[in-house]
């Protein structure tokens, strides 16, 4: 046993457990630190051979590192260069960044997002090849949207962005309360009064029907058409009166007032008549109490538009809208800054904002347990525009069915920047070559102008 003990190499002999110590002795202290007590580790480090290399202590490394930093300071980071984007790919305006896959300005970004989210359907009234630039981008929404697609804007990016915001947005509190401020309350009452004075409720009308009881959807009934066109003219006049009572509307330029009325008149007429729908009899009641069923409305001139109007009326029933809500929704349809050829679209948007706020507060205060009713109402505006576009197309075929000319006020209402340019030059039409009713820019329309002194006939309100 003694001989075995004496034959073991000692630390001072340059070997450890029979193996030569490598020259890189500083690899071992970390590993040995967990196996040997601190005192033994220090003794062992002093006994290990150096072999040309010294083992720096942690304190030495730290001192060298800190002194090195003091001698050679790191250079300061240069300031980031401002990002310069290419002009907007759609209209060549100044770009605010990359939106939905391309460099775009704020205007085109917002237009594309709204168009996709609301599934907007636009129509080009020229050759579907309009020039889109900073000046002309608001003149043709159809060609502007097509240009967005052509330059690479992505529908999926809009949807993904919307879904991302939905996930990130906190869930609204159902107990959120909405208080009607005096200003909002006054605005609501003004709009309610304007609506009621130009559109009496169904209960105020004495219903009457026609003698035509045929249930076959055949050709146009001329007698029904004559009566319906007469009532429609009165409805248009009442719509103009409604617009003149809306706060701020008459402060707009005359040209913008006419543009808004022509663009939204059919929307408002359809919304109004659909609030007079009676589901039990499947009938609609017009001004003076004229009540028609589906077949009679088809013969009166609605034609293939009939089922669309009745379907929309059925969709309104669950909303249970009162006069204030119908009036506010009509006002929002009318005062809308995205209509074509407006001189001051930003000012129109400013007038629309308090109407939107008033409708939101009123709807949520009236239905505190149904927070989604307000957006549902706003979505009906998109449906109205779609039906109105088809209604304008219906006029083209209707002109070939009626024996005489189209009533002037109805034709003028539909001959607008978003309606029927194709009526120009037709018999009885208001085209450029036919002494049209539409006024030139800056002039006042003799019939649709809100500043006109023309008053409605002394008949029942529509």
Swiss-Prot record:
GO terms for cellular component: cytoplasm; nucleus; transcription regulator complex. It is found in: Nucleus; Cytoplasm. One of its GO terms (biological process) is retinoic acid receptor signaling pathway. A motif (UBR5-degron) lies at residues 254-258. Residues 52-64 have a biased composition (Polar residues). CDD domains: NR_DBD_RAR, NR_LBD_RAR. Residues 1-87 are annotated as: Modulating. Residues 52-77, 419-462 are annotated as: Disordered. It comes from the Eukaryota. Residues 154-182 are annotated as: Hinge. Its main location: nucleus. Receptor for retinoic acid. Retinoic acid receptors bind as heterodimers to their target response elements in response to their ligands, all-trans or 9-cis retinoic acid, and regulate gene expression in various biological processes. The RXR/RAR heterodimers bind to the retinoic acid response elements (RARE) composed of tandem 5'-AGGTCA-3' sites known as DR1-DR5. In the absence of ligand, the RXR-RAR heterodimers associate with a multiprotein complex containing transcription corepressors that induce histone deacetylation, chromatin condensation and transcriptional suppression. Heterodimer; with RXRA. Binds DNA preferentially as a heterodimer. RXRA serves as enhancer to induce RARA binding to RARE. Interacts with NCOA3 and NCOA6 coactivators, leading to a strong increase of transcription of target genes. Interacts with NCOA7 in a ligand-inducible manner. Interacts (via the ligand-binding domain) with PRAME; interaction is direct and ligand (retinoic acid)-dependent. Interacts with PRKAR1A; the interaction negatively regulates RARA transcriptional activity. Belongs to the nuclear hormone receptor family. NR1 subfamily. This is Retinoic acid receptor alpha. It comes from Canis lupus familiaris (Dog). The lineage of its organism: Eukaryota, Metazoa, Chordata, Craniata, Vertebrata. The gene is RARA.
């Amino acid at each position: 046993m003694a001989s075995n003990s004496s034959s073991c190499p000692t630390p001072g002999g340059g070997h450890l457990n029979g193996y030569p110590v490598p020259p890189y002795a500083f690899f071992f202290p970390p590993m040995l630190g967990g196996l040997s007590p601190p005192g033994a580790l220090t003794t062992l480090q002093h006994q290990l051979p150096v072999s040309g290399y010294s083992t720096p202590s942690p304190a030495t490394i730290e001192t060298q590192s800190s002194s090195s930093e003091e001698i050679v300071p790191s250079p300061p980071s240069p300031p980031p260069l401002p990002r310069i984007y290419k002009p907007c790919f759609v209209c060549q305006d100044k770009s605010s960044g990359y939106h939905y896959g391309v460099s775009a300005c704020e205007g085109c970004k917002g237009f594309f997002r709204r168009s996709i989210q609301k599934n907007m359907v636009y129509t080009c009234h020229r050759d579907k090849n309009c020039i889109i630039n900073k000046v002309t981008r608001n003149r043709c929404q159809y060609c502007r949207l097509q240009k967005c697609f052509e330059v690479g804007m992505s529908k999926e990016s809009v949807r993904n962005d919307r879904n991302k915001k939905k996930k990130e947005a906190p869930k609204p509190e159902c107990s959120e309360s909405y208080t009607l401020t005096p200003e909002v309350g006054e605005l609501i009452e003004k709009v309610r009064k304007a609506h009621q004075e130009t559109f009496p409720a169904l209960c105020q009308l004495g219903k009457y029907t026609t003698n035509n009881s045929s249930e076959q959807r055949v050709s146009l009934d001329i007698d029904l058409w004559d009566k319906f066109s007469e009532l429609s003219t009165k409805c248009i006049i009442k719509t103009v009166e409604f617009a003149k009572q809306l706060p701020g509307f008459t402060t707009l330029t005359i040209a913008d007032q006419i543009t808004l009325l022509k663009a939204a008149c059919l929307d408002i007429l359809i919304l109004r008549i659909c609030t007079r729908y009676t589901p039990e009899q499947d009938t609609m009641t017009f001004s003076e109490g004229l009540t028609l069923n589906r077949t009679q409305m088809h013969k009166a001139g609605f034609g293939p538009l009939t089922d669309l109007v009745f379907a929309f009326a059925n969709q309104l029933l669950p909303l249970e809208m009162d006069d204030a809500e119908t009036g506010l929704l009509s006002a929002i349809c009318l005062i809308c800054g995205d209509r074509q050829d407006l001189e001051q679209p930003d000012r129109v948007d400013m007038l629309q904002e308090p109407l939107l706020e008033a409708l939101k507060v009123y709807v949520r205060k009236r239905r505190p347990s149904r927070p989604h009713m307000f957006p549902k109402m706003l979505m009906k505006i998109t449906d109205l525009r779609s039906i109105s576009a088809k209604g304008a197309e219906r006029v083209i075929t209707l002109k070939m069915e009626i024996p005489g000319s189209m009533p002037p006020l109805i034709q003028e209402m539909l001959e607008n920047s978003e309606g029927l340019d194709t009526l120009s030059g037709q018999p009885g039409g208001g085209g450029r070559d036919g002494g049209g009713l539409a006024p030139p820019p800056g002039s006042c329309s003799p019939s649709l102008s809100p500043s006109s002194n023309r008053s409605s006939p002394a008949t029942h309100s529509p």
